[in-house]
Amino acid sequence: MSDLSSNRLPNRASRVTNQALSAIERFLHIEALSGVVLLLAAAAALMFANSEYASLYESFWHTPLGFNFGHFTLSWDLHFWVNDALMAVFFLVAGMEIRREIHEGALADFKQAILPIVAAIGGVCLPAIIYFSFNFNSGQIHGWAVPTATDIAFALGILALLGKKIPSNLHIILLSLAIIDDIIAVLIIAFFYSTNIDPSGLVIAIAGIALVLFFQWIGFASAWLYILPGAIIWWGLMVTGIHPSLAGVILGMMTPVLPTRTLIAPLTILSNAMQILQEKNTKTDLHHISTALKKMRKGQRDIIAPVTRIQKALHPWVAYGVMPIFAFANAGVSFANFDLSSDKSFLIVLGVVIGLFIGKPLGIITASYLAVKSGLCRLPPQMTWAGILLIGFLAGIGFTMSIFVSMLAFKDIVLLDSAKIGVLCGSGLSALIGLGYGLIYIKRNKKASHSSQ
């Protein structure tokens, strides 16, 4: 530490802080672009499902894939691997997002978090009530949670199309609302769509959680080591009867939000490595250069919290890989056998479409208005009720999360396809109206700013 200048640590700490602050910008950028990829994947699925290759499309996702470990065989079809295994990675990233937001984001300050929490609750309750009211007599009420979800990638993608004239607070509230929506969706899946609970599986899951805590206590920093306890939790939840993909949420919520060490040690490592590289005799000494670079990588890893480091690494893979694959595997709805003359199918479609397209924005703006008028919270700076309505329309884009819930709610293929069609129609309407209303919102804001000048 003696040869470390007095202002070097603060300067590096400042750069680290700036990197942390830019994390949300990277998140929004990735989510916005991935919305386009998701749309293309869904369009491709619909095209295949309604073409001469429909049978090939269906048979492909039922192709068995398995592994042999001695006398132990593990085999499921591709559809299962996508929906139950790959989606665990999605929920892992979602769990990390929730963990970070609770620790240092918009959900860290309860007063600041009240508005998106209340808005999210309103945006879940009213769509569920609307769906329930349409399907109460038809006996298909178990699909009530389908229109309650929000697809964060699509919602932020539409917001990105509107450009930089949208207030930053609107981005933050939409992101916070979507994350709270994810929390509610996880709770709904765990408590309402988990059947035939087997307590023996809980023992396995708890053993996996205990192994995570043991690894953290020992100080294991490599994310690869946590695949084993994550797999144990996944298996335990499946045996229990809870959807195994929720293992990702558990693992994500357990990821540390603080660096494993204080900043002084890794910053010192970085400083020493820089000094080695600056020495003249290292310019041609590959061994010293390699040593210095290894030290820099170690210092960089230790300076970043595990939740930030792992989420940054996984997020692009989830956004551009896991979610488009999920969309391609599940958005393929055949219109050939779809019959709106069936009361059950028609009411499911109607409940989902109106729940997403009308229930979401109406629930969000009503709950927000009541919370503000009662004094429970207040609108953030630069935020208007027009902005809250825009958030409501964008939150009506359920797409991937709504499809995921519909697959848990409906086992009958005809009813499942009806729910999926409702999701696609409701999400599409919400996206179009959200984009159109967003353009009007920008023009009004521009006129208001000119008149104020």
From Swiss-Prot:
It is a multi-pass membrane protein. The chain crosses the membrane at residues 27-47, 78-98, 114-134, 143-163, 172-192, 201-221, 222-242, 249-269, 316-336, 346-366, 385-405, 421-441. GO terms for molecular function: sodium:proton antiporter activity. One of its GO terms (biological process) is regulation of pH. It catalyses: Na(+)(in) + 2 H(+)(out) = Na(+)(out) + 2 H(+)(in). Its main location: membrane. It comes from the Bacteria. It holds the Pfam family Na_H_antiport_1. Keywords: Antiport, Cell inner membrane, Cell membrane, Ion transport, Membrane, Sodium, Sodium transport, Transmembrane, Transmembrane helix, Transport. InterPro entries: Na/H_antiporter_dom_sf, NhaA. GO terms for cellular component: plasma membrane. It is found in: Cell inner membrane. NCBIfam families: NhaA. Na(+)/H(+) antiporter that extrudes sodium in exchange for external protons. HAMAP family: NhaA. Belongs to the NhaA Na(+)/H(+) (TC 2.A.33) antiporter family. This is Na(+)/H(+) antiporter NhaA. The gene is nhaA.
